[in-house]
């Protein structure tokens, strides 16, 4: 699998380079007709259409299956602490990314009415196809008592709202989360619904695997189209600003966000963690894979952070799978950047939808292979933003991914430290009662079980 992933990534980078080169040749050396340009554009649109077709179902089923997979009776306090930490750290990462990208690249004025209307859609099923938008319009005042000769204005500004085409991701995520909780509370009676949501989610991910093999070809044509359409070369400067925002977001989350969360729960010096796990961070920066870095991360947590070996080997694989802070920052910043590039005024509803969708995409990162380029398109199409411009991000996404992975691993290490601290009383009780019991029995007391009641392998 690792070799297949490597070949895929290399082919993607190769097609990006070829697409840029071909685009420059066609633009400056071999001008083409509008018909040929439209054919090239159509080949790239095939990729966007395929991803858009399954983007919304993937998000909805991921939320429902993820929530229903949480069974506190089986997983105990550790699972609850993991859920709280992952949600909290991801929310912090997304908030930092949004704050920076909206501050450095300001968007338009926000409308809170859109947020409230989309938060509680009239119909869960209609939310798949339309969302609420409002705008300020000028309307005439029809009043016979108005003295027009006096120079009084006969118009006023009024907020007008209506439902428009495009999925309401905010409403879908809220209601998917609610449905997941209700199904989970049904216990055994909801088992059929749980299995149906999980199998549908797995089926969509399998379809995505096949779609992603077309991605290098689609990206090739998208890059050609993007180069042909470039008229203002200030986009290069905008890309530089984007990279600055990303690295600033990584730094703020790593140096300020995570340490504050760690200190709030443990009341211990958070900066000792950096020295204890620096080997794992260097490995993550080199390999750009949280899974490949896991053995080194385990070693650092067990030997340097002094986390209980049994606890670490059972919880760290889970945390490293669903906790993707670096990716969350990248996705939310990239999505807002694309909107600003297209001169789209983002309402509060759009901003919240982008944040929630980025968080959900980061939770499911391990379930969708080669997610880097695909996730950006997934988020943009899910919230109704133009995904065609995402090709410009492919030029440096592979480079930023190395640093995003380092932030992911650092977040995992902080999380293990927090969860281990909160569960230390349970660990002591297990140590006292461990005599005469097998290792398997002890692990079952500490484990977070998958829905099929099998231990998650370390």
Positions of the model-derived regions?
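Small-residue-enriched core segments of transmembrane alpha-helices in multipass membrane transport
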Residues: 81-91, 200-202, 240-256, 276-283, ...
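Transmembrane alpha-helical segments and their short flanking loops
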Residues: 332-458
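Signature of multi-pass transmembrane helix bundles
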Residues: 3-9, 13, 20-28, 32, ...
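Membrane-water interface of transmembrane alpha-helices in multipass transporters/channels
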Residues: 32-39, 76, 232-241, 268-275, ...
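Membrane-interface alpha-helices at helix entry/exit sites of multi-pass transporters
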Residues: 74-81, 206, 210, 306-320, ...
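Helix-loop-helix junctions within the multi-pass membrane cores of secondary transporters/permeases
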Residues: 144, 279-362, 416
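Transmembrane helix boundary and interhelical junction motifs in multipass membrane proteins
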Residues: 55-59, 218, 289-297, 328-333, ...
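Juxtamembrane helix-boundary/capping and inter-helix hinge elements in multi-pass membrane proteins
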Residues: 67-74, 109, 187-191, 199-202, ...
């Amino acid at each position: 699998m690792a070799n297949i992933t490597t070949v895929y990534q290399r082919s993607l980078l190769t097609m990006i380079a070829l697409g840029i080169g071909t685009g420059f040749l066609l633009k400056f050396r071999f001008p083409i007709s509008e018909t040929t340009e439209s054919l090239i554009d159509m080949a790239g649109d095939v990729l966007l259409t395929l991803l858009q077709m399954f983007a919304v179902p993937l998000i909805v089923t991921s939320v429902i299956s993820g929530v229903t997979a949480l069974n506190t009776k089986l997983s105990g306090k550790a699972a609850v602490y993991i859920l709280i930490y992952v949600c909290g750290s991801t929310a912090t990462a997304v908030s930092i990314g949004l704050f920076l990208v909206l501050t450095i690249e300001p968007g338009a004025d926000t409308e809170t009415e859109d947020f409230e209307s989309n938060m509680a859609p009239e119909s869960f099923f209609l939310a798949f196809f339309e969302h609420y938008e409002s705008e300020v319009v000028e309307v005439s005042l029809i009043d016979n008592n108005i003295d027009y000769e006096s120079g009084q204005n006969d118009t006023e500004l009024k907020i007008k709202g209506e439902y428009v085409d495009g999925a309401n991701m905010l409403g879908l995520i809220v209601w998917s989360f609610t449905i997941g909780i209700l199904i989970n509370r049904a216990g055994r009676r909801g088992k059929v619904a749980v299995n149906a949501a999980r199998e549908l989610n797995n089926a969509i991910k399998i379809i995505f695997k096949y779609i992603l093999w077309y991605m290098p070809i689609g990206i090739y044509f998208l890059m050609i189209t993007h180069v042909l359409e470039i008229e203002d070369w200030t986009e290069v400067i905008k890309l530089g600003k984007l990279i600055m925002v990303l690295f600033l977001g990584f730094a703020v989350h790593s140096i300020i966000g995570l340490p504050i969360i760690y200190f709030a729960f443990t009341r211990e010096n958070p900066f000792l963690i950096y020295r204890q796990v620096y080997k794992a961070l260097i490995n993550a920066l080199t390999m750009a894979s949280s899974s490949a870095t896991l053995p080194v991360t385990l070693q650092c947590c067990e030997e340097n952070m002094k986390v209980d070996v049994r606890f670490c080997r059972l919880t760290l694989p889970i945390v490293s799978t669903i906790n993707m802070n670096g990716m969350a920052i990248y996705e939310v910043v990239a999505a807002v950047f694309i909107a600003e590039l297209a001169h789209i005024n983002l309402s509060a509803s759009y901003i919240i939808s982008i944040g929630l969708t980025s968080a959900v995409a980061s939770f499911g990162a391990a379930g969708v292979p080669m997610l880097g380029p695909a996730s950006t398109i997934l988020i943009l199409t899910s919230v109704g933003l133009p995904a065609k411009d995402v090709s410009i991000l492919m030029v440096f996404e592979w480079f930023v991914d190395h640093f995003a992975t380092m932030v992911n691993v650092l977040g995992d290490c902080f999380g293990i430290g927090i969860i281990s601290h909160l569960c230390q009383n349970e660990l002591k009780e297990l140590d006292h009662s461990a005599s005469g019991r097998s290792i398997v029995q002890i692990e079952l007391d500490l484990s977070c079980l998958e829905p099929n009641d099998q231990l998650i392998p370390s």
